[in-house]
Amino acid sequence: MELHATTIFAVQHDGKAAMAGDGQVTLGESVVMKHTAKKVRRLFHDKVIAGFAGSVADAFTLFEKFEAKLNEYNGNLERASVELAQQWRSDSVLRKLEAMLIVMDKDTLLLVSGTGEVIEPDDGILAIGSGGNYALAAGRALKRHNGGQMEAKDIARHALEIASEICVFTNDHITVEEL
């Protein structure tokens, strides 16, 4: 059985960028192994935020690879993401990794997947993991209808809270990072 980590949400709003992740790690389909995992991290001199969903061991491998690419390309988020995606897709060992990453800096928000995809959303919102669709819907509604009264970090936190009320693989122990 593998350990899985679940929901990550990221938003760009009013010149700020925020990412939130829940703390639940699940063994298989029925056992919660940890409630306080930190799946959102600051990288490259605190200028980049990255979050993962999927197999925990695979995600740590990808974090290391991504951080190495960030350092190699002097913090250029887009270049580091494309290079990681190319390596991930072409390397026979990396190709077996079961995780996804959301990475962001103040200006750019990207989804990086093992199929070689690097996707920048049109609306400045991304979510991944088992509760991703719930968080995405909640975040879009919050940004669209309350965006004038909320900061990016608040949208991120509330989107994850709503997802945790619906998805059994997402809890309400939420980590939020903001740029």
From Swiss-Prot:
Compartments where located: Cytoplasm
Pfam families, A to Z: Proteasome
Keyword Kinase assigned: no
PROSITE patterns on file: PROTEASOME_BETA_2 (PS51476)
Chain segments annotated as transmembrane: none
Residues annotated to bind Na(+): 164, 167, 170
Swiss-Prot/TrEMBL keywords: Allosteric enzyme, Cytoplasm, Hydrolase, Metal-binding, Protease, Sodium, Threonine protease
Catalyzed reaction equations: ATP-dependent cleavage of peptide bonds with broad specificity
InterPro entries: ATP-dep_Prtase_HsIV_su, Ntn_hydrolases_N, Proteasome_sua/b, Proteasome_suB-type
The family this protein is said to belong to: Belongs to the peptidase T1B family. HslV subfamily.
Protein name (Swiss-Prot/TrEMBL): ATP-dependent protease subunit HslV
Protein source organism: Listeria monocytogenes serovar 1/2a (strain ATCC BAA-679 / EGD-e)
Name of the coding gene: hslV
